[in-house]
Amino acid sequence: MKFKLIAKLLLAVMAVLPATQAMSETRVTYKSAKSTSSYYQMAVQIGKAMKAGSNGDITVTVEESQGSVQNVMEVVGRKGNYVFTTPPVLIKLARGGKAMFKEKANPRFDEIRALFPIPSLTMHFVMSKKSGVTNFSGMEGKTILLGKGSFGAREGEKYLKLFGLEGKVTLAEVELSNAVPALKNGQIDGFVAAGSYPAPNVIEAAASAGAKVLSLSDEQIKLSKRTRLEIPAGTYAGQSSAISTTSLPVVAFATTDMDDATAYALTKTFWERKSSMSAAAKWWGGVSLNMLDNILTEIHPGAAKYYQEVGAKLASHH
């Protein structure tokens, strides 16, 4: 009789245990970018870091996306621990129903809250060694590859207009994925790429073809109305000094659906695992607490708690 009672108790405990474990596990959906992009790779790295840093208590499911606008729009229908990446400026545009969010304003956009910055979209103007180009004016008469439909292509086209090069360069009809071979065989003199640094295609171009990344002047950066960014010396082969360029900050956001404890855990784990992520992928090395300045809207209270604990500087709108 006693044995049967103990057996029943053990069965009861075993039945409850999986449910208890499931309750303690935090599940997060992380909406990223196209699966072929560096930002999708970053999302996978963050997912692994969260699992390792939380001893398995945080499980991140990475979802592919067609871009930042889609990520923001999905806030309307998503509930719970939905995390997504986007340039901070898109949150302000969404709230105001402007640009790509015209006639799409929704109260849910007011519930978006920032967690932490990730590597910025960094502009690279890459010129071949053979071209001899060392500044923007030298691009006149050259063949340049911008690509199509991407942020880098749109931004590159904008800069050509801003800096007086519209109609003065030949735009190559080559896919951006073929930029390095086209540069090496002389089909193009240069290409424009936007991505976190160090960018794989720029690494290859610099190492195998002696390509040079152009620096922008202070005036050019001001004209672009983008965020200034310095690519440290030695990032690319043959780069003896820092490169001044522009960037579009990117941040991981959640909504007020996420409780403070989860937001705190995600933020704390991200920063505590950043050094190990940097060892595996250099693009994390450029992320710092100073990049909180790029967040234009509210920070999640749970994330803010962590930033206050480490003495990070927060703005009044945070």
Language model regions located:
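An extracytoplasmic/periplasmic, membrane-proximal ligand-sensing/linker region
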Residues: 178, 184-185, 195-204, 208, ...
